[in-house]
From Swiss-Prot:
It catalyses: O-phospho-L-threonine + H(+) = (R)-1-aminopropan-2-yl phosphate + CO2. Keywords: Cobalamin biosynthesis, Cytoplasm, Lyase, Pyridoxal phosphate. Decarboxylates L-threonine-O-3-phosphate to yield (R)-1-amino-2-propanol O-2-phosphate, the precursor for the linkage between the nucleotide loop and the corrin ring in cobalamin. Its cofactor is pyridoxal 5'-phosphate. GO terms for biological process: cobalamin biosynthetic process. Belongs to the class-I pyridoxal-phosphate-dependent aminotransferase family. This is Threonine-phosphate decarboxylase. One of its GO terms (cellular component) is cytoplasm. Homodimer. Transmembrane segments: none annotated.
Amino acid sequence: MLEHGGRLREAARRYDIPLADWLDLSTGIAPWPFSLPAIPEQAWTRLPESDDGLEAAACLYYGAERVLPLAGSQAAIQALPRMRRGGRVGVLSPCYAEHAHAWRQAGHLVREIGEAEVEPYLDSLDVLLVVNPNNPTGRVFEPAELLAWHARLQRRGGWLLVDEAFMDCTPQSSLAACSNRPGLIVLRSFGKFFGLAGARLGFALGERPLLQALAEQLGPWTVNGPVRHVAQSALRDRQQQRQQRERLLAASQRLEELLRRHGWPPAGGSALFQRLVDPRCAALHDYLARRGILTRQFEQPASLRLGLPADEAAWARLDAALLGFKEPAHE
């Protein structure tokens, strides 16, 4: 199983720091969760029903013709590779590692390619996978470029799979409105923007036959009743959505400025995180962890991803820790 951010208990054991004393910046999850509605008893006592309004709320929010609710977009990441015969899959990298892993596990020939390699390789691929905005680089691809790639793939029966887990603050770059086109699949994550990662909810957007085939792969009742109720409330709450976007964008800019001020100019980022690429990243990760601040470390290349502090105390704590790193004699 691949390693992910958010492994706070493991860090607490490794660094011998109590769980409650940590500042977790290792995930790209909004630190301000949407308010939770009261959950009616029948959400617990009855089996979930697909016509309860969740799909309609998601279609309206994403601007999509059809959606399939998932137990997190991870469910589709693992199921989609089993819906095609073994073929050649290009994964625009670096990106969320589960994508390449899932296609390899299903027997496909996977090539992780850079942005400059898309054009020369595209006509030899059966599937191209793009994370947009990219995790961890923050790179955003414009719809016109992605749709041009899709058209070339679709002519040969290929797929363009776009993971838009971090798209909520930049909806103008989404392909959701085009997701009814054959061979185009869009994945959306609920937990990151809404700050409710524990709900384990995501959506696949695509044409009807493909979503029906994916539903057959996943089986019934993939999303439980309480989560369906909570998600409908959040997906329809335009005021909270607007406030969340403004807050996230402001916090991301503040984090970029804080890092830059301490001599760590970000190499990219999104509304939910900033990325550092520097040979000293491993040392910074360990230094911060020894002070109870958890970040997400990557090795190829040496880099760190930092999520957003939730409050002024957290901002001050990160500020002080970064200041201390400039003084190695104190270590």
